[in-house]
Swiss-Prot record:
Residues 15-194 form the Guanylate kinase-like domain. SUPFAM superfamilies: P-loop containing nucleoside triphosphate hydrolases (SSF52540). Belongs to the guanylate kinase family. GO terms for cellular component: cytosol. ATP binds at residues 22-29. The keyword Hydrolase does not apply. It comes from Rhizobium meliloti (strain 1021) (Ensifer meliloti). This is Guanylate kinase. The keyword Transferase applies. Its EC number is 2.7.4.8.
Length: 219
């Protein structure tokens, strides 16, 4: 006889905003993609950008690709929760989608740089959990950028030149993960997410649940 299936107890909690940043080539996008595939309770915040679309990228899935004029219109109407200029291109987070998700208690992942992370921390500090991904070495970072084979030598040189300045902001993040092994780094990030979901201050439903326990009479 099979044992009865016990349904998980649902305790209301606030959604969290998971911010993952790193210099180009350190692995944040791969870790973010793997996390989304493994965790059905997490959805991606799709950024808008003025950067040219890469061959492997899909409109609306990886980014919303905009002209500079379209991007400036979004900024002017306060339609972006945060925005930044990175490697000569603009990136931003659409406000409406994030506010809707937080209102419904859903978790969202943000694959953004340190400038965007700063703005989110300033505006929604209680909801943000930030993780910075470091490469094991600068030599390995350069090797990964070349292996990716999606950028020109000029673009790779620019990204490497900017990476040191980006790494300088590591102290501003809640957690630091060194990506010397992708599986190990992914496991570390996933453990962080699970722990943050269990924080008492993220779970207002605990008050009702605990009060119910204390008033329960099993006899």
């Amino acid at each position: 006889m099979k044992p009865a299936t016990v349904s998980p107890i649902k305790i209301a909690r606030r959604g969290l905003m998971l911010v993952i940043s790193s210099p180009s080539g350190a692995g944040k996008s791969t870790i973010a993609r793997n996390l989304l595939e493994a965790d059905p309770d997490l959805s991606i915040s799709v950024s808008v950008t003025t950067r040219s679309r890469r061959p492997s990228e899909i409109e609306g899935r990886h980014y919303f690709f905009k002209s500079i004029r379209e991007f400036e219109a979004l900024r002017a109407t306060d339609s972006l929760l945060e925005w930044a200029e990175v490697h000569g291109n603009y990136y931003g987070t659409p406000r409406d989608a994030v506010e809707k998700a937080m209102g419904e208690g859903r978790d969202m992942l943000f694959d953004i740089d340190w400038q965007g992370a700063q703005q989110l921390q300033e505006k929604m500090a209680g909801d943000v959990v930030s993780i910075f991904i470091l490469p094991p070495s600068m030599a390995e970072l350069q090797s990964r950028l070349h292996r990716r084979a999606e950028d020109s030598e000029e673009v790779i040189a620019t990204r490497l030149a900017n990476s040191r300045a980006e790494i300088e902001h590591w102290r501003e993040y809640d957690y630091i993960v060194v990506n010397d092994d992708l599986d190990r780094a992914f496991s570390s990030v996933r453990a962080i997410v699970e722990a943050e979901r269990l924080r008492r201050d993220r779970r207002p439903g605990l008050f009702e649940f605990v009060n119910g326990l204390l008033t329960e009479n099993p006899l």
